[in-house]
Amino acid sequence: MGIYMRDDILDIITLTTDFGTNEGYVGAMKGRILNILKKYNKDAKIIDISHEIKPFNIYHGAYVLLTAIPYFPPSVHVAVIDPTVGSERKSIVIETKSGYYLVGPDNGLFTYVAEKLGIKRIIKIDEERYKPSSTFHGRDVYAVVGAEILINNGYDGEELDEMVKIDETKKRVIHIDRFGNIITNIKKDEVTFKYYDTIMIKIRHKNGIEKIIKCKFVKSYFEEKNNFICLINSEGFLEISKFMDNASKLLNVDYLDEIEIIY
């Protein structure tokens, strides 16, 4: 089986991890990519999307990838939020219908962005080919695969019928931005109430404590300055906010707290 070729992928690799920037992990991944590309006289822009994903939080990572990747030209995107590294979980390359390549663990991390971009192929990475350590597949597998995609203008291997998707049977908090806005995994097409309706939302914290809040469903933040609001954000998810205030702190909300619309 030969290499599956493309001629329109750009020499861009993005990195998204939960590694933070106080350690050398991100630097090791970048160094590995650059070393491989140098051997083939290739160059690439390595762009950091975020390394501040909450540790082990696949939901958070999935949302952040959605907010950034679709706005790049066709390119390579390596993501590592991998709490079960070294286990039997698969590693994959997703080629999208629009020419993007997504590289990382098959644990649901690419759920949202693959859904938006459309899946053309899902390719299983043969991890043993890369002789990885048991704890750092970001450096030993995913960085290498990302570089190989640029060198070969594609990636080849065993194709899979499906990928793992995150569990969305429960509605929950998947992101809290720097303004304290609370982003849930409730999507626009699941919302049945109308603009300017007042709705009741139950928040169930991970410790089992529940609270019910009242908020107005609006189109933008400024429309209600005194009370909590709900809106559909720019990525099509229901968001709980308070104008020029930090809703997450006011409500003591954290990642993965459960959300229920009770009207």
Swiss-Prot record:
Q: Where is this site: Important for activity?
A: 82, 89, 137
For this protein, what is the EC number? 3.13.2.3
Q: What keywords appear on the UniProt entry?
A: Hydrolase, S-adenosyl-L-methionine
Q: Which reaction does it catalyse?
A: (R)-S-adenosyl-L-methionine + H2O = adenosine + L-methionine + H(+)
- Into which EC class is this enzyme placed? hydrolase
Residues involved in (R)-S-adenosyl-L-methionine binding: 181, 221, 234, 239, 244
Pfam families attached to this UniProt entry = SAM_HAT_C, SAM_HAT_N
Superkingdom of the source species: Archaea
What InterPro entries does the entry give?
A: SAM_HAT_C, SAM_HAT_N, SAM_OH_AdoTrfase, SAM_OH_AdoTrfase_C_sf, SAM_OH_AdoTrfase_N_sf
Q: Which GO terms describe its molecular function?
A: hydrolase activity
- Specify which residues bind adenosine according to the UniProt entry for this protein: 18, 82, 181
Family statement: Belongs to the SAM hydrolase / SAM-dependent halogenase family.
Q: What's this protein's function?
A: Catalyzes the hydrolysis of S-adenosyl-L-methionine (SAM) into adenosine and L-methionine. Does not have chlorinase or fluorinase activity.
Subunit comment? Homotrimer.
Q: What is this protein called?
A: (R)-S-adenosyl-L-methionine hydrolase
Q: What lineage does the source organism belong to?
A: Archaea, Methanobacteriati, Methanobacteriota, Methanomada group, Methanococci
